[in-house]
From Swiss-Prot:
One of the GO BP terms on file: symbiont-mediated arrest of host cell cycle during G2/M transition
Protein known as: Protein E4
Function according to Swiss-Prot or TrEMBL: Contributes to multiple aspects of the viral life cycle including viral genome amplification, suppression of suprabasal cell differentiation and egress of newly formed virions. Induces host cell cycle arrest at the G2 phase by associating with and preventing the nuclear entry of host CDK1/cyclin B1 complexes. Inhibits cellular DNA replication by preventing loading of host replication licensing proteins MCM2 and MCM7 onto chromatin. Within the cytoplasm, associates with host kinase SRPK1, a splicing factor regulator, and inhibits its activity.
Family according to the record: Belongs to the papillomaviridae E4 protein family.
Region annotation (Disordered) ranges: 18-64
Protein species of origin: Human papillomavirus 35
Amino acid sequence: MADPAAAQNYPLLKLLHSYTPTTPPRPIPKPAPWAPQKPRRQITNDFEGVPSSPTTPPSECDSVPWTVLTEGSTLHLTAQTKTGVVVVVQLHL
């Protein structure tokens, strides 16, 4: 120690001379848990077997006029109720 007064003020400094730094051995790492890989889920096309052109399904409302029109990727469904109210539905794909 360079300063004897420091050893009196800080008695723990005396331990530094007897301390020899050692690096503890590293523990052997555990192997990663092994599990069989799950098969990847394949997304099937929801549109398989669906006709490419829209068709009007049979309905109990055949007595009520209604139309189905397509413009690009938009589907327009127009119907009129028995009371005369016109309902328009647009579906953008």
